[in-house]
Amino acid sequence: MSVVTVQLGQCGNQIGFEVFDALYSDSHCPQGLCSERENEAYQASSKERFFSEEENGVSIARAVLVDMEPKVINQTLSKAAQSGQWKYAQHSCFCQKEGSGNNWAYGYSVHGPRHEESIMNLIQKEVEKCDSLSGFFIIMSMAGGTGSGLGAFVTQNLQDQYSNSLKMNQIIWPYGTGEVIVQNYNSVLTLSHLYRSSDALLVHENDAIHKICAKLMNIKQISFSDINQVLAHQLGSVFQPTYSVEGSCHYRRNPLGDLMENLVPHPEFKMLGIRNIPQMSENSLTYSTFTWAGLLKHLRQMLISNSKMEEGINWQVRPPLPGLPTLGKVSLNRELHFNTSIANLVILRGKDVHSADLGGFKDPALYTSWLEPIDAFNVWKTQRAFSKYEKSAALVSNSQFLLKPLDTIVGKAWNMFASKAYIHQYTKFGIEEEDFLDSFTLLEQVVASYCNL
């Protein structure tokens, strides 16, 4: 089954390019550490998901590119074409000559309705090229204008027109120090609208990815391209094919459906995060060897201590003791910074993958009490290595990992709203104070729900 990717705004288009490039490079990598037959099956499965029929031997990304300024889209198209290996379809883009000026309301209330028909027609054409549709993967920023405002509008339209298809939004959480003065407003409006129309939100925090670039990849002057390549690696490690069941030699057909089934058991809980291990520069990799036991021990501690990378993990954090009453557990977790999960999916790729022991992730103490551990944890595997790593693990988690950043953004936006700061920028384009209040109410409920796990 195929996934149609919708790239929105500068952020969505730049990341989208890196994602397709990473997927293509990995599936055509000669060092897959598996038989030729297995490699061909992996390649065919990846291609069916993300690329359509080839023109003259070049794969075409199953994607629609949307931006209100032409510059980034033109750069993205040309970079893909220059690779000589894959490209975007000739008529898969929509762009205009004016941006949204970091104004969420302008993206949502002006650009959205004005260009709705053109954008939805492009998406429909892409859907018609798929033999069967797994769903939509929408890449966007949370705090800008076009990506976030128009992104929320397009997602809502996808929900209206393709209500039986899954929608997953990959959103970029802004830097804590802030790139845009109204980013907290934009973020609150984006999240609340997506919570109503998307099936899952896959969140990457800019601050966390920046740290990975600095500490693990040893990059001295970090560019957006560096950050986007780390993001693309993480997304590829989740979306590339894995076997359907233990011992099977058939790859999963429905990537989005399988992810949702494993990770989103209730519509109140839609926030997903990714952790990867190992992540390192080519130079460091030359001198490194890994065991599954070592990788999984670190990955489990990254999960429970809410660490985004293996450097600087807090090893003092432990799961609460069984038998503790819920209230005691909640306050103790806050004290210990223990990250309670609803559901976890571990994806293992590489050598001796079937020897990996995942018992540590099946511990009931890691999970909320209302879901059986057998339903809360899943594992996907393939012997086919990913990217440059002989062994690698990805963890997709629905947990309390975003509680603090979400609470902070809602708090900052509320303080600005209480003093009516910048509200006129939104009301003049039809986003009223009532809309803000609805958004605050919804997100405060999300915070409370995750808090009480």
From Swiss-Prot:
Q: Which residues bind GTP?
A: 143-149
Q: Which domain of life is it from?
A: Eukaryota
Chief location of this protein?
A: nucleus
- Localization annotation: Nucleus; Cytoplasm; Cytoplasm, Cytoskeleton, Microtubule organizing center, Centrosome, Centriole; Cell projection, Cilium
A single GO BP term for this record reads:
microtubule cytoskeleton organization
What UniProt keywords are attached to this protein's entry? Cell projection, Cilium biogenesis/degradation, Cytoplasm, Cytoskeleton, Developmental protein, GTP-binding, Microtubule, Nucleotide-binding, Nucleus
Q: Which cysteines are joined by disulfide bonds?
A: none
| GO MF term set | GTP binding; structural constituent of cytoskeleton
Q: Name one GO cellular component term.
A: cytoplasm
The Swiss-Prot or TrEMBL record describes its family as follows: Belongs to the tubulin family.
Assembly: Found in a complex with TEDC1, TEDC2, TUBE1 and TUBD1.
Q: What does this protein do?
A: Acts as a positive regulator of hedgehog signaling and regulates ciliary function.
Name the UniProt record assigns to this protein: Tubulin delta chain
UniProt source species: Canis lupus familiaris (Dog)
